Amino acid sequence: WGGLIGLRLVAAQPDRFARVVIGNTGLPTGHGPASDAFLKWQHFSQTTPVFPVGTLVTRACVNPLTDDVAAAYDAPFPDDSFKAGARIFPALVPTSPEDPESSANQQAWRSLELYDRPFLCAFSDSDPVTAGGDAPFLAKVPGAQGREHPTMVGGGHFLQEDLGPELAAKIRDFITETA
Protein backbone atom coordinates (compact mmCIF):
# COMPACT_ATOMS: atom_id res chain seq x y z
CA TRP A 1 0.00 0.00 0.00
CA GLY A 2 3.04 2.20 -0.44
CA GLY A 3 1.50 3.91 -3.44
CA LEU A 4 -1.74 4.85 -1.79
CA ILE A 5 -0.15 5.93 1.46
CA GLY A 6 3.47 6.74 0.66
CA LEU A 7 2.96 8.60 -2.59
CA ARG A 8 0.28 10.78 -1.06
CA LEU A 9 2.76 11.62 1.69
CA VAL A 10 5.41 12.51 -0.90
CA ALA A 11 2.84 14.67 -2.67
CA ALA A 12 1.81 16.44 0.54
CA GLN A 13 5.36 17.03 1.80
CA PRO A 14 7.69 16.81 -1.23
CA ASP A 15 10.52 18.73 0.44
CA ARG A 16 10.97 15.93 2.96
CA PHE A 17 12.06 13.47 0.24
CA ALA A 18 15.42 13.72 -1.53
CA ARG A 19 14.43 10.91 -3.89
CA VAL A 20 11.71 8.30 -4.32
CA VAL A 21 11.75 4.64 -5.36
CA ILE A 22 8.51 2.85 -6.21
CA GLY A 23 7.82 -0.68 -7.33
CA ASN A 24 4.63 -2.57 -8.16
CA THR A 25 2.33 0.17 -6.97
CA GLY A 26 0.03 2.82 -8.29
CA LEU A 27 -1.96 5.90 -7.46
CA PRO A 28 -5.23 5.32 -9.30
CA THR A 29 -7.89 7.98 -9.61
CA GLY A 30 -10.60 5.77 -11.08
CA HIS A 31 -10.50 7.55 -14.43
CA GLY A 32 -9.11 4.52 -16.24
CA PRO A 33 -10.22 0.92 -16.09
CA ALA A 34 -8.82 -1.20 -13.29
CA SER A 35 -7.20 -4.45 -14.36
CA ASP A 36 -9.24 -7.63 -14.17
CA ALA A 37 -6.63 -9.05 -11.81
CA PHE A 38 -7.08 -6.12 -9.43
CA LEU A 39 -10.87 -6.25 -9.56
CA LYS A 40 -10.77 -9.96 -8.74
CA TRP A 41 -8.42 -9.27 -5.81
CA GLN A 42 -10.65 -6.44 -4.58
CA HIS A 43 -13.73 -8.67 -4.72
CA PHE A 44 -11.93 -11.56 -3.02
CA SER A 45 -10.70 -9.35 -0.19
CA GLN A 46 -14.25 -8.32 0.63
CA THR A 47 -16.02 -11.64 0.24
CA THR A 48 -13.74 -14.46 1.33
CA PRO A 49 -14.66 -15.87 4.75
CA VAL A 50 -10.99 -16.61 5.52
CA PHE A 51 -8.22 -14.10 4.77
CA PRO A 52 -4.91 -16.03 5.04
CA VAL A 53 -2.33 -13.23 4.80
CA GLY A 54 0.76 -15.47 4.61
CA THR A 55 -0.83 -17.62 1.92
CA LEU A 56 -1.90 -14.54 -0.06
CA VAL A 57 1.61 -13.08 0.04
CA THR A 58 3.05 -16.45 -1.01
CA ARG A 59 0.66 -16.65 -3.98
CA ALA A 60 1.70 -13.17 -5.12
CA CYS A 61 5.36 -14.20 -5.25
CA VAL A 62 7.11 -16.00 -8.08
CA ASN A 63 9.42 -17.91 -5.75
CA PRO A 64 7.85 -19.92 -2.92
CA LEU A 65 8.25 -18.49 0.56
CA THR A 66 9.49 -20.70 3.34
CA ASP A 67 6.91 -21.71 5.92
CA ASP A 68 8.67 -19.46 8.46
CA VAL A 69 8.45 -16.40 6.22
CA ALA A 70 4.78 -17.05 5.40
CA ALA A 71 4.10 -17.48 9.12
CA ALA A 72 5.78 -14.14 9.78
CA TYR A 73 3.23 -12.45 7.52
CA ASP A 74 0.47 -14.11 9.55
CA ALA A 75 2.03 -13.28 12.92
CA PRO A 76 0.53 -9.79 13.43
CA PHE A 77 -2.97 -11.24 13.10
CA PRO A 78 -3.90 -13.65 15.93
CA ASP A 79 -7.30 -14.18 14.28
CA ASP A 80 -9.46 -12.72 11.51
CA SER A 81 -10.79 -9.95 13.76
CA PHE A 82 -7.34 -8.33 13.51
CA LYS A 83 -7.40 -8.27 9.70
CA ALA A 84 -9.96 -5.51 9.16
CA GLY A 85 -7.31 -3.09 7.91
CA ALA A 86 -5.73 -5.59 5.56
CA ARG A 87 -9.15 -6.52 4.21
CA ILE A 88 -10.38 -2.96 3.66
CA PHE A 89 -7.32 -1.59 1.84
CA PRO A 90 -8.29 -3.06 -1.56
CA ALA A 91 -11.75 -1.51 -1.25
CA LEU A 92 -10.17 1.92 -0.76
CA VAL A 93 -8.50 1.84 -4.17
CA PRO A 94 -10.51 4.07 -6.52
CA THR A 95 -12.02 2.22 -9.45
CA SER A 96 -14.24 5.14 -10.51
CA PRO A 97 -13.91 8.93 -10.18
CA GLU A 98 -16.80 8.86 -7.68
CA ASP A 99 -14.89 6.70 -5.18
CA PRO A 100 -14.14 8.58 -1.94
CA GLU A 101 -10.34 8.34 -2.34
CA SER A 102 -10.31 9.51 -5.95
CA SER A 103 -10.08 13.23 -5.22
CA ALA A 104 -7.18 12.77 -2.77
CA ASN A 105 -5.29 10.75 -5.37
CA GLN A 106 -6.03 13.36 -8.05
CA GLN A 107 -4.64 16.04 -5.74
CA ALA A 108 -1.55 13.90 -5.11
CA TRP A 109 -1.00 13.52 -8.86
CA ARG A 110 -1.07 17.31 -9.28
CA SER A 111 1.82 17.52 -6.82
CA LEU A 112 3.72 14.56 -8.27
CA GLU A 113 3.51 16.15 -11.72
CA LEU A 114 5.76 18.87 -10.27
CA TYR A 115 8.13 16.54 -8.38
CA ASP A 116 11.52 17.06 -10.01
CA ARG A 117 13.73 15.22 -7.54
CA PRO A 118 15.09 11.80 -8.53
CA PHE A 119 12.30 9.26 -8.94
CA LEU A 120 12.92 5.60 -9.80
CA CYS A 121 10.38 3.00 -10.93
CA ALA A 122 11.44 -0.61 -10.33
CA PHE A 123 8.48 -2.78 -11.36
CA SER A 124 8.56 -6.54 -11.79
CA ASP A 125 7.81 -8.50 -14.93
CA SER A 126 5.45 -10.98 -13.25
CA ASP A 127 2.83 -9.06 -11.29
CA PRO A 128 -0.54 -9.14 -13.08
CA VAL A 129 -2.06 -6.55 -10.74
CA THR A 130 0.47 -3.75 -11.32
CA ALA A 131 1.71 -4.64 -14.82
CA GLY A 132 2.23 -1.40 -16.72
CA GLY A 133 1.66 0.65 -13.58
CA ASP A 134 4.95 2.42 -14.04
CA ALA A 135 3.78 4.11 -17.27
CA PRO A 136 1.91 7.05 -15.66
CA PHE A 137 4.87 7.81 -13.39
CA LEU A 138 7.34 7.66 -16.27
CA ALA A 139 5.14 9.98 -18.31
CA LYS A 140 4.08 12.47 -15.65
CA VAL A 141 6.72 12.75 -12.90
CA PRO A 142 9.56 15.09 -13.96
CA GLY A 143 12.03 13.38 -11.62
CA ALA A 144 11.51 10.10 -13.47
CA GLN A 145 12.61 11.58 -16.78
CA GLY A 146 16.01 10.89 -18.32
CA ARG A 147 16.99 7.82 -16.34
CA GLU A 148 16.92 4.06 -16.77
CA HIS A 149 14.14 2.32 -14.86
CA PRO A 150 14.79 -1.36 -14.21
CA THR A 151 12.33 -4.12 -14.89
CA MET A 152 12.84 -6.62 -12.10
CA VAL A 153 12.89 -9.90 -14.02
CA GLY A 154 11.57 -12.90 -12.12
CA GLY A 155 9.69 -10.96 -9.48
CA GLY A 156 6.07 -11.12 -8.48
CA HIS A 157 4.20 -8.47 -6.54
CA PHE A 158 6.38 -8.63 -3.44
CA LEU A 159 9.78 -7.67 -4.81
CA GLN A 160 11.35 -7.73 -1.36
CA GLU A 161 10.65 -11.45 -1.21
CA ASP A 162 11.38 -12.51 -4.79
CA LEU A 163 14.29 -10.22 -5.59
CA GLY A 164 15.32 -8.57 -2.33
CA PRO A 165 19.09 -8.40 -2.91
CA GLU A 166 18.66 -7.37 -6.56
CA LEU A 167 16.19 -4.64 -5.63
CA ALA A 168 18.47 -3.43 -2.84
CA ALA A 169 21.35 -3.17 -5.34
CA LYS A 170 19.20 -1.08 -7.71
CA ILE A 171 18.20 1.22 -4.86
CA ARG A 172 21.81 1.49 -3.64
CA ASP A 173 23.00 2.40 -7.15
CA PHE A 174 20.19 4.95 -7.54
CA ILE A 175 21.09 6.62 -4.25
CA THR A 176 24.77 6.70 -5.20
CA GLU A 177 24.01 8.17 -8.64
CA THR A 178 21.71 10.86 -7.25
CA ALA A 179 23.57 11.82 -4.06
Language-model features, listed with the residues they occupy:
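Conserved alpha/beta-hydrolase catalytic His-Asp/Glu region
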Residues: 30-33, 50-106, 110-112
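Gly/Ala-rich beta-loop-alpha elbow adjacent to hydrolase catalytic centers
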Residues: 2, 6
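Alpha-helical elements of Rossmann-like donor-binding domains used by nucleotide-donor carbohydrate transfer enzymes
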Residues: 8, 55, 72, 88, ...
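Catalytic active-site module of serine/aspartate enzymes centered on a nucleophile-bearing elbow/loop
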Residues: 145-179
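Flexible "cap/lid" loop of the alpha/beta hydrolase fold
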Residues: 7, 11, 16-53
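Short aromatic-enriched loop/helix-cap "lid" or pocket-rim segments at secondary-structure transitions
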Residues: 31-36, 41, 84-87, 132-135, ...
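Conserved loop-alpha-helix segment in the C-terminal half of the alpha/beta-hydrolase fold
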Residues: 119-155
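Generic structural signal for small/hydrophobic residues in well-ordered secondary structure
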Residues: 73, 86, 112, 121-124, ...
